[in-house]
Amino acid sequence: AEIRGRIRGTTDLAVAVGETAWVQECVFEKIEVKREVFAELDAKTPPGAILASSTSTFPGSTFTAEVKGRHRCLVAHPINPPYLVPLVEIVPTPWTSPETTVAAREFMAEIKQVPIVLKREVPGFIVNRLQVALLGEAFRLVEDEVIGAVDLDHAIADGLGLRWSFMGPFETIDLNAPGGIRDYVERFGQPYYEIAVGQSPARKWNEPLVSKVEQERRQVLPANQIQERQRWRDLYLMSIVANKNSRRED
């Protein structure tokens, strides 16, 4: 109640951002719209305010180049659903000041998020690039009749995902060989490379393939139950996050 009492709505942008220290832009994924919004934010916010974008794919340099105060602009990309997943990707542009990047990371850590800072811009940042690689192979395996979509999901949910929910891929392989990561690479580097060669080139997710995966998904989850399943997802995520937080305190 105390927090809600400090929140008020307004349709006047100048009123909304006139005294703020941080702005989180969440408009449509259209560069032209973001350019207009950032130009307006730059004119209506205090000089020291950080202007952050929630964009999922566009480097900040594509829509902040002409902003007068571009040194205080960057990307702070949250992960869906952002009210439960703590990770935030901090992506400075070539002209973002080091002070802005440091302040952004400190602010996110202060509000109990888990910020990671990219050393330079790349399209899609980190999480989406990893997700694109995994989804690309998942669709390929289904298209090539290697496995069905439902069993593919089990490979992550009941396999890799269990470890990945509390360890990253490098820590995973570091612990999967007696001598650590170098030992792992010496054992599996060549066969993994040969597999990777077979995963090129990238394929588009064509309509017949999407229809095939969708049909499998609708068999296990009818469309009218998606919202209910989203609530289930959120509750499950809450329990995972709570468990991780409790173990960090151990």
Regions found by a protein language model. Give the residues of each.
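A short alpha-helix-loop-beta-strand transition element characteristic
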Residues: A1-E2, E99, I147-A149
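Rossmann-like NAD(P)-binding element
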Residues: A1-L51, F58-P59
